[in-house]
């Protein structure tokens, strides 16, 4: 994959990365590297892809930066929520960054992604910017959903990112509908429908998988298994936690979701399979560092030793840092400098997002129904709006 393609995934971050490469000894080589995944892929009724993943120095550095931006964004969102600048629900993604970044590296913007409510980092991976992300979190007009969606409803139409959905598992049938449209239009594209292990027992998921298999739709169902559905451990909710086998007659693949290169390899394989043969299930073995949401401290149903153990042994950013240092692509000091600049970039984005005003009260009635069908929201014709926003 060419460096020019790699450097367009998250535009603001990539521009910074390019400047860093030019100014320092950080490698800008596009010479291929072959790196083995952390663990083998485990497959169900399909031969797994090779563990040997082709990458480049530029791609590894981009992975490091993109995941670091996402991590810093989520940590900042935690602080903004505690300061009551973010209201309502807020679900953070720190720890799971490799899934968003690795998936994006394997596909194009013509492919579609739809996910649940833990959606901030997927939005960034699809090309969203920090200002619109923070503005949306704080309910501001400059947000990606005009401040009306909040944490759970990020959206980016021009990148085929269909959100952020708050109803557990309900995004999967919608994703299979997107895959139906792709096949109907004879496109060489696929849809990735993401859901968590807590949603894996939903009946609608199996209904959608059945029709996708029947019609051989290019649908990839991605279970982000972070091992806890809210506060419920997977073993307490699932008789069979081997989610990649849940499709029965549909092939499946279990992936180390903390290894960005493994995610990239699996998603590339899954897209090719889905376009040619129909649906496939990917189980991403990952982990969230925060609790389920901001009301969950995340330490009542798991030990602090468990969390710190994952951080020390499987953290996706640290894994890439080690690869960069092992291949002499940058020095430890240069990576630290990059992280300092990321903190400033995030702080600047927050300041800019705060300058955006709250939505006007008239926005209560916009974007509720599709235009052109003669349907309006009840009360939209009132001359004086009684509703007010704080």
From Swiss-Prot:
Pfam families: E1_dh. It catalyses: N(6)-[(R)-lipoyl]-L-lysyl-[protein] + pyruvate + H(+) = N(6)-[(R)-S(8)-acetyldihydrolipoyl]-L-lysyl-[protein] + CO2. Its cofactor is thiamine diphosphate; Mg(2+). Thiamine diphosphate binds at residues 117-118, 166, 168, 197-199, 226, 292. SUPFAM superfamilies: Thiamin diphosphate-binding fold (THDP-binding) (SSF52518). GO terms for biological process: pyruvate decarboxylation to acetyl-CoA. GO terms for molecular function: metal ion binding; pyruvate dehydrogenase (acetyl-transferring) activity. Residues 1-15 form a transit peptide. It is an enzyme of class 1 (oxidoreductase). Its EC number is 1.2.4.1. Pyruvate binds at residues 91, 117-118, 166, 168, 197-199, 226, 228. Residues 293-312 are annotated as: Disordered. InterPro entries: DH_E1 (IPR001017), PDH_E1_Alpha_Subunit (IPR050642), Pyrv_DH_E1_asu_subgrp-y (IPR017597), THDP-binding (IPR029061). Keywords: Magnesium, Metal-binding, Mitochondrion, Oxidoreductase, Phosphoprotein, Pyruvate, Thiamine pyrophosphate, Transit peptide. Residues 302-312 have a biased composition (Basic and acidic residues). Mg(2+) binds at residues 197, 226, 228. It is found in: Mitochondrion matrix. GO terms for cellular component: mitochondrial matrix. The pyruvate dehydrogenase complex catalyzes the overall conversion of pyruvate to acetyl-CoA and CO(2). It contains multiple copies of three enzymatic components: pyruvate dehydrogenase (E1), dihydrolipoamide acetyltransferase (E2) and lipoamide dehydrogenase (E3). Tetramer of 2 alpha and 2 beta subunits. This is Pyruvate dehydrogenase E1 component subunit alpha-1, mitochondrial. It comes from Oryza sativa subsp. japonica. The lineage of its organism: Eukaryota, Viridiplantae, Streptophyta, Embryophyta, Tracheophyta.
């Amino acid at each position: 994959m060419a460096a020019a393609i790699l450097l367009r995934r998250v535009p603001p971050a990539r521009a910074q990365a390019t400047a860093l490469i030019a100014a320092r000894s950080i490698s800008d080589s596009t010479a291929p590297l072959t790196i083995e995944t952390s663990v083998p892929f485990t497959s169900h009724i399909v031969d797994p892809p090779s563990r040997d993943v082709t990458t480049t120095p530029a791609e590894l550095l981009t992975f490091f930066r993109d995941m670091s931006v996402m991590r810093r964004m989520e940590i900042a969102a935690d602080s903004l929520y505690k300061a009551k600048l973010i209201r309502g629900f807020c679900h953070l993604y720190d720890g799971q960054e490799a899934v968003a970044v690795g998936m994006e590296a394997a596909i194009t913007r013509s492919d579609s992604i739809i996910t649940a409510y833990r959606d901030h980092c997927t939005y960034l991976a699809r090309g969203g910017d920090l200002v619109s992300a923070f503005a949306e979190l704080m309910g501001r007009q400059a947000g990606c959903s005009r401040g009306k969606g909040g944490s759970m409803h990020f959206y980016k139409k021009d990148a085929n990112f269909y959100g952020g959905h708050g109803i557990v598992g309900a995004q999967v049938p919608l994703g299979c509908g997107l895959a139906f449209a792709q096949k109907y239009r004879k496109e060489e594209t696929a849809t990735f429908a993401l859901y968590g292990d807590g949603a894996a027992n939903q009946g609608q998921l199996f209904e959608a998988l059945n029709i996708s298999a029947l019609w051989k739709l290019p649908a990839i169902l991605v279970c982000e298994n972070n091992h806890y559905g809210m506060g419920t451990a997977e073993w307490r909710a699932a008789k069979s936690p081997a989610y990649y086998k849940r499709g029965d007659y549909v092939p499946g693949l279990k992936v180390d979701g903390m290894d960005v290169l493994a995610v990239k390899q699996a998603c590339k394989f899954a897209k090719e399979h889905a376009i040619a043969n129909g649906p496939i299930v990917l189980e991403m073995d990952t982990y969230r560092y925060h609790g389920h949401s901001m009301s969950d401290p995340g330490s009542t149903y798991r030990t602090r030793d468990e969390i710190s153990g994952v951080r020390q042994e499987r953290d996706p950013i640290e894994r890439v840092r080690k690869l960069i240092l092992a291949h002499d692509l940058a020095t430890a000091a240069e990576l630290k400098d990059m992280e300092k600049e990321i903190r400033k970039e995030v702080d600047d984005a927050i300041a800019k997002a705060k300058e955006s005003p709250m939505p006007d009260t008239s926005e209560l009635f916009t974007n509720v129904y599709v235009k052109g069908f003669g349907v309006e929201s009840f009360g939209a014709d009132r001359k004086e709006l009684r509703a007010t926003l704080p």
